Amino acid sequence: FILSIQKNEFNINIDRNDQPDLENIEHNYLNSGGQFWLAINNHQNIVGTIGLIRLDNNMSALKKMFVDEGYRNLKIGKKLLDKVIMTCKEQNIDGIYLGTIDKFISAQYFYSNNGFREIKRGDLPSSFPKLDVDNRFYYRNLKD
């Protein structure tokens, strides 16, 4: 699902080997205190994903937020993000970092409209899992 959107829709030069976290979601997300959610339609097809990784110092990373092209603008992304934010607040996480790419223009507007502000790569915590293709980074403070 994720790789199909990255490669087929956005022509991103990335493959499964560049995203080892997807090979073992239990180990890379769940066992470290994070989560990984799926949005499923009435036909039991995946139409959205979002992941949360715990970082050092009560911080977290938002990963793998994707919504199927046919299901965008139906508030699925907003519901997934709201679930992440609620989970972070329940776990006393102070902030959420994320990386994206400049081709995901709609995603950048989405993050900005949902309380994220753009930051520089150098402002990311050292424990943030960076992808080589990421060239835009965002942060949302949850303490306020």
Regions found by a protein language model. Give the residues of each.
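Acetyl-CoA-dependent GNAT
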Residues: 1-63, 68-69, 81-83, 87, ...
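Residue-level signal for short amphipathic helical patches enriched in basic/charged
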Residues: 13, 91, 99
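A short linear-motif detector with a strong N-terminal bias
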Residues: 14-18, 59, 76, 96, ...
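Conserved residues at beta->alpha junctions
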Residues: 67, 91, 102
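Glycine-rich phosphate-binding loop
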Residues: 71, 75
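Conserved acyl-CoA
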Residues: 79-96, 110
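C-terminal "cap" of GNAT-fold acetyltransferases
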Residues: 94-97, 101-105, 109-144
